[in-house]
């Protein structure tokens, strides 16, 4: 059995760890509320522009933007959204597991893949896996800014416009609630009205000043909105997962401290009993 001093040192070490995890839990809870507010603010706009862009895929117009044209897929692009930091449970590993499955699927179909990584965890994973990384952005902080994302994403959009890739996918973690986050993998381009729930009715819009300028601008905004929404969803998921993970760690530390105190008390009781036995034995010998 360990000595009383060793057990006391262990208890002190676990108590210090619990203080850290408790502080991280409180910080994550504060950041989680702000991240959820940003995510909820982005959702209505993202869903609306997704629906309008979906209607455009069924619209009656002579001009067809490349984002609306389906073509045979010889190469695909992937935008992978992960967190910059860890200590958020299985958030990143669950998403990366889905990404690996999709990458194997593309490989089995003979499709080449090029990746854009948003977040340090996904970037490191893609580097280790040997995937072709054409752009990446890290260090977004607690507040996502579209200006920081556009440069990395534009590389993929230019590749799509130039015919270097024939489809663009995005993987991120969707926020369901504080206790549940869901890894998702969606096709961003080419845009399909059926995929976003747009009715198959042939929509007939009146464009001012002309169809090309309106559609070009709208579809770029569609991509930007969905990228921003994905990052906002992922950040809300990250802070929620981190808060839950740190709470679990704090609770486990409390349990360990209780167990160690029980062991310490037993060791102390055994030492006292031994000393009393030695005293009694010595007195009897005299």
Swiss-Prot record:
| The keyword Lipoprotein belongs to this UniProt entry's keyword annotation | no
Q: What GO MF annotations does this protein's record show?
A: ATP binding; proton-transporting ATP synthase activity, rotational mechanism
The family database entries (InterPro entries) matched by this protein are listed as:
ATP_synth_F1_ATPase_gsu, ATP_synth_F1_gsu, ATP_synth_F1_gsu_CS
Could you tell me the keywords of this UniProt record? Answer: ATP synthesis, Cell inner membrane, Cell membrane, CF(1), Hydrogen ion transport, Ion transport, Membrane, Transport
| Membrane topology summary | Peripheral membrane protein
Q: Name one Pfam family in it.
A: ATP-synt
Quaternary structure and interacting proteins, as annotated? F-type ATPases have 2 components, CF(1) - the catalytic core - and CF(0) - the membrane proton channel. CF(1) has five subunits: alpha(3), beta(3), gamma(1), delta(1), epsilon(1). CF(0) has three main subunits: a, b and c.
PANTHER family named among the record's database cross-references: ATP SYNTHASE GAMMA CHAIN, ATP SYNTHASE SUBUNIT GAMMA, MITOCHONDRIAL
- According to its UniProt record, which protein family does this protein belong to? Belongs to the ATPase gamma chain family.
Q: What is this protein called?
A: ATP synthase gamma chain
What organism is this sequence from? Dechloromonas aromatica (strain RCB)
What phylogenetic lineage does the species belong to? Bacteria, Pseudomonadati, Pseudomonadota, Betaproteobacteria, Rhodocyclales
